[in-house]
Swiss-Prot record:
It comes from Acaryochloris marina (strain MBIC 11017). Its EC number is 7.1.1.-. InterPro entries: NADH_UbQ_OxRdtase_su1/FPO, NADH_UbQ_OxRdtase_su1_CS. This is NAD(P)H-quinone oxidoreductase subunit 1. It is found in: Cellular thylakoid membrane. NDH-1 shuttles electrons from an unknown electron donor, via FMN and iron-sulfur (Fe-S) centers, to quinones in the respiratory and/or the photosynthetic chain. The immediate electron acceptor for the enzyme in this species is believed to be plastoquinone. Couples the redox reaction to proton translocation, and thus conserves the redox energy in a proton gradient. The lineage of its organism: Bacteria, Bacillati, Cyanobacteriota, Cyanophyceae, Acaryochloridales.
């Protein structure tokens, strides 16, 4: 396994060369990963909302946001400010506690999932040994919040939306977990850092998408369903359910659903990049690049530059899949609820089980290529 670039160590060494003590250098490093996560999640939501509007406008031969900032880039900020100052209305005959708790239970687990997401080598809040299991466990909390929101709203459309959301989330959670288990089986670890390191060192040929094409498609389809993106947006189908479980929500409570949806979409895009496309790993191995430019691969400056490029690579891969998710909204029709459940239980689940067994067999037969 390629140990990768220890960005923390290189950062501390660079500061020590400038005259700082090891303690001060480590103290300076400590808040940087957390700040990057907060900034990354916030900027990711703003950029994804702006991209969705621009790409949607282009698909419909419109201009989209234009006047609020350059190219309308401040339109998502204006939307956020508007929602903050909107009146928070709680309809009569609702359960106020469940009505308030619903959106909170949907949003908080998504933000906690960012704890284990690496944007680059050692650029994450914590490298949990059970990182993937932690993320799957957190993602299973959201259906409870969706059911609460639908049930407590005292509205038939909200209730139907909540039931659809819970059924959809439960149906596609299992194929998603099976796809991830195949990756975990190859990397022999539940840590996202170990999964990326297992793919590094061979460039694009080492990425899991080469060895797990079925698992990748399975994960991507299930992730779209978990994010309630077209063609799987049945819980909030405007033509059928007004806005689904969000129908009775306004102000900041509605904003929490809106925020959670896009944060989850960005999270899923990053996880696709991390699990199947090498995360921060470059398409060409760093050692090969060092040979081309005649530089020592262990040079501190070269490793810092490579780590910076790795951060850019992670974001580029993630935003490519974000672009695909937005494009799918305008290119595929919505499925019916019976088609959605049949597809999840009768197709994706068996395919996930077969893929897991196939991975186990290939690992035994070719341990050098499948992480034996």
């Amino acid at each position: 396994m390629n140990p990768g670039i220890d960005l923390e160590q290189r950062f501390v060494e660079t500061l020590m060369e400038l005259g700082l003590t090891p303690g001060v250098a480590k103290t300076i490093w400590l808040p940087i990963p957390m700040l990057l996560m907060i900034i990354g999640a916030t900027v990711g939501v703003l950029v994804s909302v702006w991209l969705e509007r621009k790409i949607s406008a282009a698909a419909q031969q419109r201009i989209g946001p234009e006047y609020i900032g350059p190219l309308g880039i401040l339109a998502p900020v204006a939307d956020g400010i508007k929602l903050v100052f909107k009146e928070d209305i709680v309809p009569a005959n609702t359960d106020p506690w469940l009505f308030t708790l619903g959106p909170i239970l949907v949003v908080i687990p998504v933000f906690f999932s960012y704890l284990i997401v690496p944007f680059g080598q050692n650029i994450l809040i914590t490298d949990l040994g059970i990182g993937i299991f932690f993320w799957i466990a957190l993602s299973s909390i959201a259906p409870i919040g969706l059911l609460m929101a639908g049930y407590s709203s005292n509205n038939k459309y909200s209730l139907l939306g909540g039931l659809r959301a819970a059924a959809q989330s439960i149906s596609y959670e299992i194929p998603l977990a099976l796809a991830v288990l195949a990756v975990v089986m190859m990397s022999n670890s539940l840590s996202t850092i170990d999964i990326v390191n297992q793919q590094s060192g061979y460039g694009i040929l080492g990425w899991n998408v080469i060895r797990q094409p079925i698992g990748f498609m399975l994960f991507w389809i299930a992730a779209l369903a978990e994010c309630e993106r077209l063609p799987f947006d049945l819980p909030e189908a405007e033509e059928e359910l007004v806005a689904g479980y969000q129908t009775e929500y306004a102000g900041m409570k509605f904003a929490l659903f809106y925020l959670g949806s896009y944060v989850n979409l960005v999270l899923s895009s990053i996880l696709v990049a991390v699990l199947y496309f090498g995360g921060w790993d470059l398409p060409i191995p760093a050692t090969m690049i060092a040979d081309w430019i005649n530089v020592d691969p262990n040079n501190a400056i070269f490793e810092l530059v490579t780590a910076g490029l790795g951060l850019v690579m992670t974001l580029l891969k993630a935003y490519f899949f974000l672009f695909l998710a937005i494009l799918l909204r305008w290119t595929v029709p919505r499925v019916r609820i019976d088609q959605l459940l049949d597809f999840g239980w009768k197709f994706l689940l068996p395919v996930g089980l077969v893929n897991l067994l196939l991975t186990a067999g290939l690992k035994l037969a070719f341990p050098f290529a499948f992480g034996g």
